[in-house]
Amino acid sequence: MQPPGDDAAPRCPFAGAHAPDAPHVPEAAGDDVQAGWHRAQLDFSQSMSYGDYLSLDPILDAQHPRSPDHNEMLFIIQHQTSELWMKLALYELRAALASIRDDALPPAFKMLARVSRVLEQLVQAWNVLATMTPSEYSAMRPYLGASSGFQSYQYRELEFILGNKNAQMLRPHAHRPAIHAHLEASLQAPSLYDEVIRLLARRGFPIAPERLDADWTQPTRHDRTVETAWLAVYREPNAHWELYEMAEELVDLEDAFRQWRFRHVTTVERIIGFKQGTGSTSGAPYLRKMLDVVLFPELWHVRTTL
């Protein structure tokens, strides 16, 4: 509000640090050369630029097609960007695990929601790869050797954190000791869902001792006492609001994860049909079998019980 009798026009708070009473003088045509385009900084010889901050040079220099085929660049970038999204998903899941252990659930909700959005990005990425035809893929496939997404150690850690444990999946990484050790630690640690079940016990729900002291290297299996606890939560959500919200965040997460897996299968079938995968898996049949994996079984079964 202007003081009484003050006829000066109000200044925009974002107008910069010019003197308030200075008259506006149009800039000369050549002023942009000296002051920067629309006052933007143009000289980064002494300061950090966008490319410096993001380390773009090594990232954009990390694509090395092995074939003369035009479409290999798409194949490489598709998988590299997926690995970057998985890096973010793992970063958020580790933070969510720590928050759940500390009974700090609101931050965990935000992190889990973000992971679900990351998975949506990964689902959409298959649409780009699906522009590659079977003929185009066949031209570059011999250059892939035995490399396969099956060997992605970030994907394997993601599966382990979400509870789909399988010690045999360590073997493809035996030639890289540091990665093997990292994955083995993830295999032996409680999964995200294991920590949520511990949370249920801390909130007073009677969870079977053998479930709370389970062999963490084994995949998640349905437990009656866990389903009974979730049933109580869903029947009185207002009395257990944080647990109710946690349950729904987990369902959102698994829903998105299933969609990612399904889109993977359909893209593979579209491009290579039912040929053997480059990593010697059965290809599409192997991926279809993975669609049957249920990460949080009680949360799905309780919907029938309600």
Curated annotation (Swiss-Prot):
One of the GO BP terms on file: L-tryptophan catabolic process to acetyl-CoA
Cofactor dependency: heme
Keywords: Dioxygenase, Heme, Iron, Metal-binding, Oxidoreductase, Tryptophan catabolism
Enzyme Commission (EC) number: 1.13.11.11
Molecular function terms from GO: heme binding; metal ion binding; tryptophan 2,3-dioxygenase activity
Catalytic activity: L-tryptophan + O2 = N-formyl-L-kynurenine
Job description of the protein: Heme-dependent dioxygenase that catalyzes the oxidative cleavage of the L-tryptophan (L-Trp) pyrrole ring and converts L-tryptophan to N-formyl-L-kynurenine. Catalyzes the oxidative cleavage of the indole moiety.
Family in the record: Belongs to the tryptophan 2,3-dioxygenase family.
Protein name: Tryptophan 2,3-dioxygenase
Species classification: Bacteria, Pseudomonadati, Pseudomonadota, Betaproteobacteria, Burkholderiales
